């Protein structure tokens, strides 16, 4: 799920492009199950004909290979995971910090830390290194 980069570990996300039709999600999750790959967080965006399934999984490179072999178009990109306390308003506070730093968030979704049980906001932005630095300097736990 991660890759070492300089002095930290980068969180990896699998993006899968698929037709918006019955059984596709079950097929994707079945492929991952057969490869013994755990889904740690996911969000799906759809349109009338196609969708994008974004996932943080236990082995993104293996998942990508298996899904490509099954005919899916997919790729792996860097994302940021930020652990937050499970309290009302914490997402708003995180987003306000980014807004005040002139950072735009492309999309976000929720996962959770299996060890601590705390929520993890997974999000994508244009400049991951800048955002990581900004959040760490303000006391956030960046994964």
Which residues does each predicted region cover?
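A conserved regulatory-domain signal marking ACT and ACT-like small-molecule sensing domains
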Residues: 6-143
